[in-house]
């Protein structure tokens, strides 16, 4: 039996420049606020009142730690955060992997939620994110989340280990609903 996939009203846009690439499917491609975010894959299947008010975004975060402090992971690896849109609620489902220079690895899965009201200073986490550690050969065992009221962004932090070089990669699957 063959699997057949049909895509109705498919819109594909690709922008390739340094540290920026996105492919957008569906009506989310008409949402101009997406242009400010980097490295996203957006999926939508219609909308309630405006393009992009009900959609899913998938993006990658990365960073590098050298000690036991919290290291923020960014869209571009250095300083680009995922800024939440006004009057929108979010559910995030994240996969994180860390690999130390000696080959030891940590793998984690995290679920949580956030929302933003009418301005950047109204952003908040919804409850406490649930962290599931699948394997931790490094001995770090944690990722943390916070929000920035200065720009209304969701912040992702990996907790490193003293005197250990670790590269971090996070894949975030983010459902967003605006009203």
Report residues per predicted region:
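Internal, hydrophobic beta-strand segments that form the core of beta-sheet-rich folds
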Residues: 90-95, 170-173
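Assembly/interface hotspot detector across virion components, adhesins/toxins, and nucleic-acid enzymes
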Residues: 1-4, 113-117
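Periodic small-residue-enriched repeat registers in elongated scaffold domains
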Residues: 2-4, 9-82, 170-173
